[in-house]
Amino acid sequence: MSIPADLKYTESHEWVRTEADGTLTVGITDHAQEALGDIVFFEVQELGKTVTAGDTVAVIESVKAASDIYAPVSGEIIEANTAVADTPDSVNSTPYESWLFKIKPAADATQDRLIDADAYTKSIGA
């Protein structure tokens, strides 16, 4: 199982990459896609909306289960990955390239929900 050291993570199995412009790119971890199984559907429900850290932003469905995807920080959901919506199984094969949405953090947003790769590895017992 892959857990890249250059990303941040949430306890709810999202990975987070900070871009040069300060926006955050969000996807689900390798561990999450393994637990879900074959992913068949993805939809961002809050595109263009301002959300609070921990709010449900999207849903991802597999042949086994449906799972909510949460905002890692407070901010505005500025983009959804339409390529993943068209081919959701790409999350199974390339979870760290198949990002789900981008969020522009609010000016007062904290990243206290985010943990590093070592802490995430421990949290999943890997």
UniProtKB/Swiss-Prot annotation:
Cofactor note (record): Binds 1 lipoyl cofactor covalently.
Residue ranges annotated for the Lipoyl-binding domain, each copy included: 23-104
Residues with N6-lipoyllysine modification: K64
InterPro entries: 2-oxoA_DH_lipoyl-BS (IPR003016), Biotin_lipoyl (IPR000089), GCV_H (IPR002930), GCV_H/Fam206 (IPR033753), GCV_H_sub (IPR017453), Single_hybrid_motif (IPR011053)
Gene3D superfamilies: 2.40.50.100
Keywords from the named record: Lipoyl
One family name in Pfam for this protein: GCV_H
UniProt GO BP: glycine decarboxylation via glycine cleavage system
Cellular compartments per GO CC: cytosol; glycine cleavage complex
Named cofactor requirement(s): (R)-lipoate
Family that this chain belongs to: Belongs to the GcvH family.
Entry-linked NCBIfam families: gcvH (TIGR00527), PRK01202.1 (NF002270)
Function per UniProt: The glycine cleavage system catalyzes the degradation of glycine. The H protein shuttles the methylamine group of glycine from the P protein to the T protein.
Assembly notes: The glycine cleavage system is composed of four proteins: P, T, L and H.
PANTHER family named among the record's database cross-references: GLYCINE CLEAVAGE SYSTEM H PROTEIN, GLYCINE CLEAVAGE SYSTEM H PROTEIN-RELATED
Protein name as it appears in the record: Glycine cleavage system H protein
Organism: Paraburkholderia phytofirmans (strain DSM 17436 / LMG 22146 / PsJN) (Burkholderia phytofirmans)
Source organism phylogeny: Bacteria, Pseudomonadati, Pseudomonadota, Betaproteobacteria, Burkholderiales
